[in-house]
Amino acid sequence: MMDKAIFNGLGRRKTSVARVYIVSGNGKLTINDKIFASAEEYFKDRVRARHAFEPLVVTNNDGKLDVFVRVEGGGLSGQAGAVRLALARALIKMDTSFKPVLKSHGMLSRDPRMVERKKYGLRKARRAPQYSKR
């Protein structure tokens, strides 16, 4: 593995942070130091798994690269979004010709939406206690 070029990318979504390392290979997937046959085993859902690894499909690299993922924080949906952004950024480092394709599919923009904080006097961020007129 030392003779092959390693490309990395960092992605964030909500409170999740993902670091992705890609190496030319045969499609081996490692998430948090565990080898998985498919992403569905980790994300426990086909939709989230497809969402996370969509950059590979769009750039026709599915099964051509070994992917090493380190992801932490948040839930599975946030982690899938973080992996998607990190993977797209790593692919651009590998080959800059992928940039227009990934950009047109909206895979290079960091989703800025975060959970709104809870305010005092309210039950949740915006949910107010029930109002009684009399």
UniProtKB/Swiss-Prot annotation:
Quote the Gene3D superfamilies the UniProt record gives.
Answer: 3.30.230.10
GO molecular function list:
RNA binding; structural constituent of ribosome
Q: Which GO terms describe its biological process?
A: translation
List the GO cellular component terms: cytoplasm; small ribosomal subunit
Q: Short name of one Pfam family for this protein?
A: Ribosomal_S9
Q: Which InterPro entries match?
A: Ribosomal_Su5_D2-typ_SF (IPR020568), Ribosomal_uS9 (IPR000754), Ribosomal_uS9_bac/plastid (IPR023035), Ribosomal_uS9_CS (IPR020574), Ribsml_uS5_D2-typ_fold_subgr (IPR014721)
- Record key words, sorted: Ribonucleoprotein, Ribosomal protein
Give the similarity note.
Belongs to the universal ribosomal protein uS9 family.
Q: Which NCBIfam families does its entry note? A: PRK00132.1
Please report the name of this protein according to its UniProt entry.
Small ribosomal subunit protein uS9
**Could you tell me which species this protein originates from?**
Pseudothermotoga lettingae (strain ATCC BAA-301 / DSM 14385 / NBRC 107922 / TMO)
